[in-house]
Amino acid sequence: MLTSVRSLMAATLLVGSAFVATPVLAQDDEEVTEAEVEADSAFSISGNVALVSDYRFRGVSLSAGDPALQGGIDVSHESGFYIGTWASSIQGGTPYGELELDVYGGWTGEVASGVTVDVGLLYYVYPTTDDPLNLDPDTDYFEPYASISTTVGPVGATAGVAYAWEQDSLGGNDNLYLYTDFSLAIPGTPVTATAHAGYTDGVLAPPFLAGTGDDTGLDWSLGLTAAVYGGLSVGVSYVGVEGPSIDGFTDDAIVATLSFAA
């Protein structure tokens, strides 16, 4: 019911970001062939780290309204295939614990002029499961995803879907998530405005998590992000969900973000 891990150390992320692949340099007395250079540059490694005032996953707080540390590392091939991992600190209590770790892989590429698709499989893992009664709860689950995006001038748009089939960790139920994202780069400034809307049909719907029994619900957000220097950026967003407002869980919130990516 979550999406990332925040306990991944900032140092780990910064080291990961420093691993960005570059062409092979001279190796003492060994001659580097053109083929070796091409093979090396076919892969790239990127990293990111962020501090957020509240970890909101599809509008629902997974950090009880408190700050969270997040980060991830991706390895990509020029063919479009990639693998990666992302982590976040959480306050999941019983049985989710204090850490979410996401492992994923997929393919992304341009399928038409200005149109990009992204398809893959995401695995949500909770390695610090809180199990005081030794019930050995099943918390981890898989979720395939797909999205299509395009950019026209300063405007970007994405539509996506994620579907978790029936799994024990979801109580034997499934979950469908549909969403759309928009971005607008404000000309002459380092600021980008963003908007998001999502719809959940399943056990992860905000109203269902809030205890209403309604397994459908909406989430939304509006935000601004500003590039500060290099890969450093700051952002703020207003996040809301459909259903009862539970403080530190399903209430509307203003979320601040400080992030670095390389």
Model-derived segments and their meaning:
Residues 79-85, 113-119, 153-159, 188-195, ...:
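Repeated loop/turn-to-beta-strand initiation elements of outer-membrane beta-barrel proteins
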Residues 74-80, 106-110, 149-153, 183-187, ...:
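Structural signature of outer-membrane beta-barrel channels/translocons
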Residues 1-44:
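Cleavable N-terminal export/targeting peptides
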Residues 39-53, 81:
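Transmembrane beta-strand segments of Gram-negative outer membrane beta-barrel proteins
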Residues 222, 226, 249-262:
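Outer-membrane beta-barrel "beta-signal"
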Residues 41-43, 65-69, 97-101, 138-142, ...:
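Residues that define the transmembrane beta-barrel architecture of outer-membrane proteins
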Residues 139-212:
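Detector for outer-membrane/organellar transmembrane beta-barrel domains
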Residues 51-57, 87-91, 109, 123-127, ...:
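Transmembrane beta-strands of outer-membrane beta-barrel pores
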